[in-house]
A protein has these predicted regions:
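Short beta-strand-turn/beta-hairpin segments enriched in glycine/proline and small hydrophobics
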Residues: 8-36, 126-143, 168-170, 176, ...
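Edge-of-domain interaction segments
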Residues: 248-303, 307-350
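Surface-exposed patches in structured soluble domains
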Residues: 15, 44-47, 134, 141-187, ...
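Long, amphipathic coiled-coil "stalk"/hairpin helices in large membrane-associated assemblies
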Residues: 7-69, 143, 147-155, 161-163, ...
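Beta-strand/loop subdomains of soluble extracytoplasmic proteins
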Residues: 9, 173, 180-233, 287-291
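Structural motif
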Residues: 43, 49, 125, 157, ...
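Extended amphipathic alpha-helical segments
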Residues: 8-11, 68, 72-76, 80-82, ...
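Structural microfeature recognizing short secondary-structure transition sites
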Residues: 208-276, 286
Length: 350
């Protein structure tokens, strides 16, 4: 039995998933005329990398048509401006001779015609911008650094707007969704607040018989219980998951340290709260009913009720009214009563 100090680990497990994943679908249609050789499942891509290109001829024609229409509208606007100036000058000459107090109508000054010409110019500018945008969309680029999960595009294929031809997931981070009981979630400091710093965590996965770890932190928690399991999903974020993991043992293993693979089932250890008074004991010492059989230097058994804070694979973290010098019985007894005298050996107590 060891008096605890520091943070109690919170253990869980979940499946590794990417922090972001999207379908790749063209926004315009046409025949595919070029495909990046790197646009294949499993390959890494960078933000802005062109994945494939759609034939541009039709879209360039639309741009030229829009440019020509815009040029016509610019000439029409100049003509409308000149007509308006002439109409105003003629009216001023007429009014100065025949009707000095008169007010000219907008139609007389050709103001509606001028506004119509200005609106037509704006409309053609918008059409040109739309044509250029459609042309730019013939080049389909990766929106972020990531990996190709799947692709289904080939040279000569007819691409349809909105129809997915591939899927990418982000390379900057991965997430592990860890379902925890409310008792375990309560051990994570600041889970429901934005105060304080990041809560450290580690994702641990097996690869070729060797266990590897990747550093991470608690990113957030779902605000609703899973209706089936009644657990809280805590999301642990692992930055740079595709870097080599840290081996937790030095004995022989496969050549090269692996990344944290998407879809891998991983264990997670989260740095929990640090209570002021708790004990770490072997899991074998915990008896049914959350009791520990403790024996003092006098060889007398005391049955101590405990509150279990956390259970690990080989140890449990508990609080209870233990006395100085007591050890926990981990074997050698089928039953015990309070006050029973026993003889202890090193392998039977801890």
């Amino acid at each position: 039995m060891v008096p605890g100090s520091g943070a109690i680990p919170v253990y869980g497990a979940g499946t590794v998933r990417p922090s972001a994943e999207i379908d790749i679908a063209p926004q315009v249609g046409g025949r595919v005329v070029w495909v990046d050789p790197g646009f294949r499942s499993g390959e890494r891509v960078v933000a802005g990398q062109m994945l494939f290109r759609i034939e541009e001829a039709d879209y360039r024609t639309r741009v030229r048509e829009a440019e020509a229409a815009l040029a016509d509208r610019k000439v029409a606007l100049l003509q409308a401006q000149e007509d308006a100036e002439i109409a105003r000058a003629e009216y001023e000459r007429y009014s100065s001779r025949h009707d000095p107090a008169g007010v000219a109508s907008a139609l007389t000054l050709r103001e509606p015609q001028l506004k119509a010409a200005q609106a037509a110019l704006l409309r053609e500018e918008a059409r040109l911008a739309e044509a250029n945008l459609a042309l730019s969309r013939t080049r389909i680029e990766a929106p972020f650094d990531g990996f190709v999960r799947e692709e289904s595009v080939a040279l000569g294929q007819l691409a349809v707007p909105g129809e997915p031809v591939g899927r990418l997931f982000a390379a900057d981070a991965a997430e592990v969704v860890v379902p925890l009981s409310d008792a375990d979630a309560a051990l994570i400091p600041g889970l429901w607040t934005t105060e304080g710093g990041e809560v450290s965590a580690r994702a641990i996965a097996d690869y070729g018989g060797i266990r590897y770890a990747w550093p991470g932190y608690v990113d957030r928690a779902e605000v609703s219980l899973d209706e089936r399991t009644r657990t809280i999903d805590v999301i642990v974020r692992v930055p740079d998951p595709f870097a080599a993991g840290e081996p937790l043992q030095t004995t022989g293993g496969p050549l090269g340290d692996p990344p944290l693979l998407v879809g891998k089932f991983a264990e997670v250890a989260i740095e929990g709260l640090a209570p002021s008074d708790y004990f770490q004991v072997r899991r074998a010492a915990l008896q049914p009913g959350n009791e520990i059989w403790a024996v003092g230097r006098d060889g007398v058994v005391r049955i101590v009720p405990v509150r279990v804070l956390q259970r690990g694979d080989d140890e449990v973290f508990v609080t209870g009214a233990f006395e100085r010098g007591q050890a926990a019985i981990i074997g050698g007894l089928q039953f015990a009563t309070d006050g029973m005298a026993v003889r202890t050996g090193g392998s039977a107590t801890q």
